[in-house]
A protein has these predicted regions:
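Membrane-interface extramembranous regions
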Residues: 1-144
């Protein structure tokens, strides 16, 4: 395999694995958080996060285009931002969202999910650089 092919596969598999861990943790925790609700329960939000992580991971594996890397980056960065925000800031309920403040890392899987989301942010960002670069150059070659 060519060096760029190995790099591509490493980034794709790594990003998908990190998003898979994120999805597994959120799926596992969702039932325990169903009682925490305003209009939407925290468990429902966890299931949405899990679904988005699965889709983004599959996109990166199956179709490693810039749009797939952007999706993976947005899902992982959004998840990481949410867990950090609600860990350190008591935001309270926001519209249909429940009060998700949880001043601890002791919840089983919470820290693992945060690490996985952080890894996915880095890997998806690198994937976007690797797979997103050169698009204009390829387009120019096709036009000439």
């Amino acid at each position: 395999l060519a060096r760029s092919s190995i790099t591509s596969w490493t980034l794709r598999v790594g990003t998908a694995a990190a998003l898979g861990i994120d999805a597994a943790v959120h799926t596992h925790l969702a039932p325990a958080y169903d009682p925490v609700k305003a209009t939407v329960s925290q468990g429902q939000l966890f299931r949405v996060e899990a679904g988005l992580a699965i889709v983004a991971g599959l996109l990166v594996l199956i179709r490693p285009r810039p749009s797939s890397w952007i999706a993976a980056l947005l899902v992982s960065a959004g998840g990481l931002a949410a867990v950090l925000l609600y860990r350190y800031v008591d935001v309270g309920p926001l519209g249909p969202l429940p009060d998700m403040y949880e001043n601890t890392w002791q919840v089983p899987g919470k820290l693992l999910s945060a690490y996985a989301e952080g890894a996915a942010v880095v890997l998806a960002g690198l994937g976007l650089l690797v797979h997103g670069g050169g698009t204009r150059a390829r387009a120019k070659r096709r036009l000439s």
